[in-house]
């Protein structure tokens, strides 16, 4: 186990060292130290390269200025030519075409549509349809149905059931049962029931005693089993 841990530590250390070497190469830290140790000849060459690079932007800036001047001159010529051509055509079109179209087409169409179509349709729908339907439904349907149901159905059914069914049942069934069944049962069944009930009571008391003894014997065993099950779970 210890050897396995040493192997893991060694492999992780080697991977970390390799990663550090790659990061150092990417950041060019070694190049900084080499520049400090470079000879003066290399420094002079670097200065000459910087001067040549600075001279190139100056020449490019002069060329850009010349190009800008040429573009400005060409744009001025184009503007003069466009100013000479455009003002001849525009006022004629604006003076001749626009007022005719505005005077002929627009005022003729709009008032006709507004005067003929809109005011005729709306009052008819409002005057004919809406007020006729609502009062009829309110006057005819609702008050007719409710009082009929309340006046006809409810008071008729309840007193009939109370007046017809209850006294008949009380008058017919009860005295017959009291007059026929009770004396016969009292005259015939009591001595036999007394002889049989004594034997049943004795057997029932003996069975109850047996059941009580079984319950008393089995109750500690049940409690012990319940404790064991509770400990297991």
From Swiss-Prot:
Principal localisation: membrane
Bias kind Acidic residues: ranges: 61-71
Keyword hit for Glycoprotein: yes
Any GO BP: cell adhesion
Modifications after synthesis and translation: Phosphorylated on serine residue(s).
Region (Disordered): 35-219
Protein name: Serine-rich 25 kDa antigen protein
Species of the source: Entamoeba histolytica (strain ATCC 30459 / HM-1:IMSS / ABRM)
Species classification: Eukaryota, Amoebozoa, Evosea, Archamoebae, Mastigamoebida
